[in-house]
Regions:
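Active-site region of glycoside hydrolase catalytic domains
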Residues: 1-50, 54-55, 99-100, 109-290
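Active-site mouth loops of central-metabolism enzymes
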Residues: 56-69, 147-149
Length: 290
């Protein structure tokens, strides 16, 4: 009997994100991100998002494990473990500190050049997320973040920059990490702050629509730069169980999951499924399809 197993080219590895390990939050021209205003928490204390970076407050992303300065020894350890791939992300604010600049920050671009070269030296395939639970805080303050359609253009410019720069070093890309988490935690991934009296779901789903457009544009753009790119998007899998077998509970659990899973339908098919259109209509949510 033939033994089943993983193929020799299976990408075995591990995953992190820039805001989780790089530190150096304001080094070499990097600007503040939404992750940089998230305070530390504890078992009995939830993390908070402050209005900008405050003195004397502990922000885990500011130092992290100082991967920015120690990546060579860390990648060497991964190579020693036999990693075939390493998923991490590019910090948007290392490349465009405020998010809306026309020219990128060369120091940030060079860091990722060096990081990817180090990975490839050990035969480790970089798997890169373009936006992983962070975005320029400058875009939050100036534009209201992803609620503004102009964010699509800023993101596309960012994608064009990194796709072009790393087209011969990175093959595997993800446009967003867990793009559907915006429905649960709107600030960290999308920079959404609510005004008094707003229909929060209206804001969330309009911002999500902008991110979906940006994700689609990134795929088209990436393949125009390098047809061999493998580009996808990471989604959160929030499973909801019905409390009882009562049909009302079962339908409520299905609707709860549909609010997250429709992102998959849009990515795969290019349009909103009918169940989501009905949900939006029932809740007086009008998406500007532009």
């Amino acid at each position: 009997m033939k033994k089943s197993g993983l193929s020799e080219n299976f990408l075995w590895g591990g995953a992190v994100a820039a805001n989780q390990l790089e530190g150096a939050w304001n080094v070499d021209g990097k600007g503040p991100s939404t992750a940089d205003v998230a305070t530390g928490g504890a078992v009995d204390k939830a993390r908070e998002y402050t209005d900008g970076v405050l003195e004397g407050v502990y922000y885990p992303s500011h130092d992290a494990i100082d991967f920015y300065h120690r990546y060579k020894e860390d990648i060497a350890l991964l190579g020693e473990m036999g990693f075939k791939c390493f998923r991490t992300s590019i910090a948007w604010t290392r490349i465009f500190p405020n998010g809306d600049e026309s020219e990128p920050n060369e120091a940030g671009l060079k860091f990722y050049d060096d990081l990817f070269d180090e990975c490839l030296k050990y035969g480790i395939e970089p798997v890169i997320t373009i936006s992983h639970y962070e975005m320029p805080y400058g875009l939050v303050e100036k534009y209201g973040a992803w609620r503004d359609r102009r964010l699509v253009d800023f993101y596309e410019n960012y994608c064009k920059t990194v796709f072009t720069r790393y087209k011969d070093k990175v093959k595997y890309w993800m446009t967003f990490n867990e793009i559907n988490v915006i429905t649960l935690h709107p600030f960290i991934p999308a920079g959404i702050k609510f005004n008094d009296g707003e229909n929060k779901e209206q804001v969330i789903y309009q911002a999500a629509h902008h991110q979906l457009i940006a994700s689609a544009k990134a795929v088209t753009l990436g393949h125009s730069i390098n047809p061999d790119f493998k580009i996808g998007c990471m989604l959160l899998y929030p499973l909801t169980y019905a409390e009882t077998c009562n049909p009302n509970d079962v339908m409520a659990s299905i609707e709860a999951m549909n609010k997250h899973y429709f992102f998959t339908d849009v990515h795969a098919r290019g349009y909103y499924p009918n169940y989501m259109k009905k949900y939006l209509e029932r809740n007086n949510i009008e998406i500007k399809m532009e």
